[in-house]
């Protein structure tokens, strides 16, 4: 088994080890042979994140996860142990913890980039991943094979360190009125 302690992967780990990381990505998911495309903006900070994309806004403060659909005025609140579903819906959330969920099966150089094939070592809804990293540890793309047979491909448009946010940033600041359907599964 190859070690994650090598230049691009170590740089990626350091990027997530303190502060926050902002990621803008486009993705395509093949569901029952039909492509579903979209984009997302993610801010990851430790076990917390904020995600926006395709009409949904997701907050995770480390304890609770809110999935908000503004157009249908619905919000689902779950405990953060429901991250399994979040990883399947947006595998880029796993980037901060690649070495906790995967082992390196193989790697190859492609110019100054490194392409990794990773096998899951922990149940996260993803059985295999192919991730391409720039020499500085930035993720350029990923292809994630879900356990249900579907595949998610992501192209990272931008990825950068950003200032650390207050923990309150990772919880919705608004109240959901009586015109909202709120499902609280905590």
Description of each model-found segment:
Residues 33-35, 55, 72, 123-126, ...:
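Glycine-centered tight beta-turn/hairpin loop motif at sheet-sheet or coil-to-beta transitions
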Residues 80-111:
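Flexible, surface-exposed loop/linker segments and immediately adjacent secondary-structure boundaries
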Residues 1-35, 47-48, 73, 172-186:
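N-terminal leader/targeting segments and the immediate start of mature chains
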Residues 21-27, 38-42, 47-51, 127, ...:
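One face of beta-strands
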Residues 41-89, 152-153:
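An acidic-aromatic
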Residues 110-111, 121-127, 134-186:
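Non-transmembrane domains of secretory- and envelope-associated proteins
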Residues 26-29, 50-54, 115-122, 141-145:
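Short beta-strand segments that buttress and anchor functional surface loops
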Residues 43-45, 107, 132-136:
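Short beta-strand micro-motifs enriched in acidic
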């Amino acid at each position: 088994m190859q070690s994650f302690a090598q230049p691009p992967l170590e740089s990626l780990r350091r990027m997530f080890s303190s502060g926050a990381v902002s990621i803008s990505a486009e993705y395509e998911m093949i569901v029952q042979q039909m492509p579903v495309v979209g984009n997302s903006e993610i801010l990851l900070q430790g076990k917390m994140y904020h995600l926006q994309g395709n009409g949904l806004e997701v907050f995770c403060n480390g304890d609770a996860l809110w999935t908000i659909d503004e157009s249908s005025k619905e919000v689902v609140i779950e405990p953060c142990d429901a991250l399994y579903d979040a990883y399947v819906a947006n595998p880029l959330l796993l980037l901060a913890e690649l070495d906790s969920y995967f082992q390196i099966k193989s790697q190859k150089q492609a110019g100054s980039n490194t392409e990794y094939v990773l096998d899951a070592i922990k149940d996260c809804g993803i059985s295999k991943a192919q991730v391409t990293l720039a020499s500085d540890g930035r993720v350029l793309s990923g292809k994630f094979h879900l356990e249900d047979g579907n595949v998610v491909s992501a192209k990272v448009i931008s990825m950068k360190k950003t200032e650390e946010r207050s923990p309150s940033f990772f919880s919705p600041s608004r109240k959901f009125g009586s015109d909202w359907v709120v499902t609280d599964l905590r």
